[in-house]
């Protein structure tokens, strides 16, 4: 009798157990379906969610407004040209002008014919455009997860998703090949001196992650033309001239790029991006004043060692005064003021060059 009851209980429990099992499985399926229906945000969407719709729209409009002549080009081309910063030629000029100084000073030192100087200036102009573009592309590849945390840079091609990293790397290869073609058109000394600069160009974007002085590395890259200018016209590399000229330009670059960095300092604090703007803070202006005086001293040494004429010193003194006045007047807490001061350095760089060019022309005409 007991055995019969036990068997009946087990039989009655089996349907209950199977029902419970089915219910459990169905609940798991429903739960998984509900989880899978939740939207999966990309890293780009997560980053952009930190900004208000108004900030995102303002960044987009600012980017489109700055395209200028590039708006007339095919839409597919534009992001790649933006990687080169073709819509912002300030950096290209600031890279190129020290090359002009060195080329013209080297031509002055050996009384090189005008066509030799013009040829070198033409090749360096193409090279600076291409290699500055390559440097910006490298910077955007490294910084794609930092640029999306700063309002001014979140619309850059890689950060905004308009260009993928593999596409950017391929475009970098094209630019490097074009830069190599320019180098091969110059004397061999320019080739190996130019190749020595590549590690600095590649390493610069990493410096803002672990040091407050990435501007020091960038200044090395932007001063390298002071070394290349001499062999470009067939002159021996006179280190007594090239080194003080290099240091003078290094200081100048450190000055204007620190002013530039003050534009983003509030965003940089939260993004973990380091710069001299954050390192120096309220002491920035006194430091930049001292650096500008030192810049003038090294520039004068370069002129003395190259036996330059009056144009070099008159124009140089005026240019240094402009930089000092720029440091005095710039409002480091105002983005527009910082940008205006930064871009004014193009005119300052040309003033330096006009003084050197004046002496060179006087030499060719036989007045020096």
Regions found by a protein language model. Give the residues of each.
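N-terminal mitochondrial targeting presequence
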Residues: 1-64
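Core segments of transmembrane alpha-helices
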Residues: 92-99, 171-178, 218-227, 288-300, ...
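Membrane-embedded alpha-helical segments that form the functional core of polytopic membrane enzymes
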Residues: 96-142, 152, 173-183, 191-202, ...
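Helix-loop junctions at the membrane-solvent interface of multi-pass transporters
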Residues: 104-105, 184-186, 207, 231-232, ...
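Multi-pass membrane catalytic core of lipid/isoprenoid biosynthesis enzymes
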Residues: 123-126, 144-194, 270-312
């Amino acid at each position: 009798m007991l055995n019969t009851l036990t068997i009946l209980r087990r039989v009655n429990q089996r349907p209950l157990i199977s029902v419970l099992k089915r219910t459990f499985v169905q609940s798991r399926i429903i739960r998984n379906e509900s989880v899978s229906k939740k939207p999966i945000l990309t890293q780009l969407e997560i980053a952009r969610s930190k900004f208000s719709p108004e900030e995102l729209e303002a960044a987009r409009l600012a980017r489109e407004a700055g395209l200028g002549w590039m708006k007339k080009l095919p839409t597919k081309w534009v992001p790649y040209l933006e990687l080169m910063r073709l819509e912002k030629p300030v950096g290209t000029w600031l890279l190129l002008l020290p090359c002009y100084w060195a080329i013209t000073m080297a031509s002055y030192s050996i009384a090189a014919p005008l066509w030799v100087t013009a040829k070198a200036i033409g090749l360096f102009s193409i090279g600076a455009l291409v290699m500055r573009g390559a440097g910006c592309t490298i910077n955007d590849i490294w910084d794609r997860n930092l640029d999306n945390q700063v309002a001014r840079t979140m619309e850059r091609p890689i950060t905004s998703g308009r260009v993928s990293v593999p596409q950017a790397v391929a475009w970098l290869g094209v630019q490097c090949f074009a830069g190599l073609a320019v180098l091969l058109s110059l004397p061999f000394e320019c080739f190996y001196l130019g190749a020595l600069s590549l590690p600095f160009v590649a390493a610069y974007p990493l410096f803002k992650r672990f040091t407050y002085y990435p501007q020091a590395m960038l200044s090395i890259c932007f001063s390298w033309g002071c070394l290349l200018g001499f062999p470009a016209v067939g002159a021996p590399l006179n280190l007594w001239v090239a080194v003080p000229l290099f240091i003078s330009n290094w200081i100048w670059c450190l000055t204007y790029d620190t002013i530039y960095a003050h534009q983003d300092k509030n965003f940089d604090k939260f993004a973990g991006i380091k710069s001299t703007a954050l390192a120096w803070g309220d002491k920035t202006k006194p430091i930049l004043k001292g650096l500008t005086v030192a810049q003038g001293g090294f520039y004068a040494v370069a002129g003395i060692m190259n036996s330059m004429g009056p144009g070099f010193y008159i124009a140089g003194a005026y240019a240094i005064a402009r930089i000092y006045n720029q440091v005095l007047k710039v409002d480091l807490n105002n983005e527009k003021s910082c940008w205006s001061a930064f871009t004014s350095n193009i005119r300052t760089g040309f003033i330096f060059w006009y003084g050197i060019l004046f002496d060179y022309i006087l030499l060719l005409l036989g007045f020096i």
